[in-house]
From Swiss-Prot:
The active site is at D49 (proton acceptor). SUPFAM superfamilies: NAD kinase/diacylglycerol kinase-like. This is NAD kinase. InterPro entries: ATP-NAD_kinase_N, ATP-NAD_kinase_PpnK-typ_C, NAD/diacylglycerol_kinase_sf, NADK. It is found in: Cytoplasm. Its main location: cytoplasm.
Length: 270
């Protein structure tokens, strides 16, 4: 009999994911796992990477005591180690799973400060972006205390090493191994001519540095925290840092990072 490990399942709306979640739930109940959505030990994501990101943000304020495990039911599951055909293997892995052997990935802390003194703090697993709704974004970019540049363009993306394979990669950023404790700044359609200049290439920023963006006072900024999008105005500054917060993945059938990258983007090498 299971020793009472507490789990919770989160799925997406596809029929395949619903069926997989239902089947896995029945297996786990038969094996006497405890279902707890308030204080789970392991959150099982059934779907794709978007589902895993949603699960992470649902438990964003419990990351110090929650581990995640992904079952993917689609075409691309960078954060998922199992498929919908591996459900009995999932149960076996949960029996054998040891919290001390969890895999940890760094998160970026994002602090948004407003002109009235109000602040919000979020953490992201993939990336955070800032852009304007329809016009050119203008903002000063500081690396720690140094004014690095005045950016003009569609926006900026700041990503984690694991997030470097997501939106960051699609806008020309580099792929960075999670062992490299750093943040990456990638420009979104920067404006470069004889009048206005930006660096024009991605930047890898060291662990101890902070990145601060001070946007011009406009009222139509769009900020994303992974897959979550918010509209803000009166933003004074946005500070990005690595504060030591991590997400923990159950080390059940963990696939090495470069193997994940190869399988996700290259496929079979002949």
């Amino acid at each position: 009999m299971n020793f009472g490990k507490k789990v919770w399942l989160i799925g997406n709306s596809s029929e395949k994911s619903k069926k997989t979640l239902n089947k896995l739930s029945k297996i786990l109940k038969a094996e006497h796992f405890v279902f707890d959505d308030i204080n789970p030990e392991i959150v099982i994501s059934v779907g794709g990477d978007g589902t895993l990101l949603r699960a992470m943000h649902m438990y964003e304020y419990q990351l110090d005591r929650v581990r995640f495990l992904g079952v993917h039911t689609g075409h691309l599951g960078f954060y998922t180690d199992f498929t919908d055909e591996d459900l009995f293997e999932v149960v076996e892995a949960l029996y054998d799973e040891n919290p001390a052997q969890a895999i940890h990935y760094p998160l970026i802390r994002v602090q948004v400060s407003f002109t009235d003194g109000y602040q919000i703090v979020r953490h992201v697993l993939n990336e955070a972006t800032i852009r304007r709704a329809s016009k050119t974004m203008v903002g000063d970019v500081r690396i720690s205390d140094y004014l690095f540049e005045r950016f003009r363009g569609d926006g900026l993306s700041i990503s984690t090493p694991t997030g470097s394979t997501a939106y960051n990669k699609s806008i020309g950023g580099a792929v960075v191994h999670p062992r490299v404790k750093a943040m990456q700044v990638a420009e979104i359609a920067s404006l470069n001519n004889v009048v206005y200049r930006t660096l024009g290439s991605p930047m890898i920023v060291a662990e101890k540095d902070t990145i601060t963006v001070c946007p011009a006072p406009e009222d139509d900024y769009s900020l994303t925290f992974d897959q979550l999008t918010f509209e803000y105005k009166n933003i004074k500054s946005i500070e990005f840092s690595l504060d030591g917060t991590t997400i923990s993945f159950a080390n059940c059938a963990h696939t090495p990072f470069w193997e994940r990258v190869s399988k996700s983007f290259i496929g079979e090498v002949e």
